[in-house]
């Protein structure tokens, strides 16, 4: 399968959101810091945090799922830079303590976790979700639990059939030859907001930002690694989320 056609630097006016409220993300009214998790976005939710339009759409989607016996529960939503950095440091310390080299530890981390400042969860448009109406134990964000006899298989099937109606799209698909983060059947993004935000994010000097941050292991972020991370981890996603 051919590689995803990566987004071009288009203006916000090129983003078509005809099926949704005209509340598309307006970067002129938003601090650039919000794109990298260092701002203070206005968020809504009880036990989770999303931007208003994404929150309203989620509430409608959750209500529709309830009618089918599915109780959508948000495991993760908005995460600021500090939160993402805690995740990064915890994993980096654990993997290097287990004997992995710094480079191998970083490679293992970015199978599922983002480098602080690059997470879609910084935007308050993305959610990790499960079904609370089932019996489960242990780690919940595991692909096999969303397939076959897994406790969240019914949720996955319902989302595949209905989530797009509410503006939510899976981010990291199981598409053949897709690179970057591994398949995450639990991670959905509210496209009417996240698409234009990604367009604006692309305009930032991501390479310069990553090289300037003093993260654990960041001395190994050479130009080749950063270019690959941007191309594969940030941009090789569901084409429906690309402008």
Segments (PLM) and residue ranges:
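Extracytoplasmic cell-surface/polysaccharide-interacting catalytic and binding patches
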Residues: 1-243
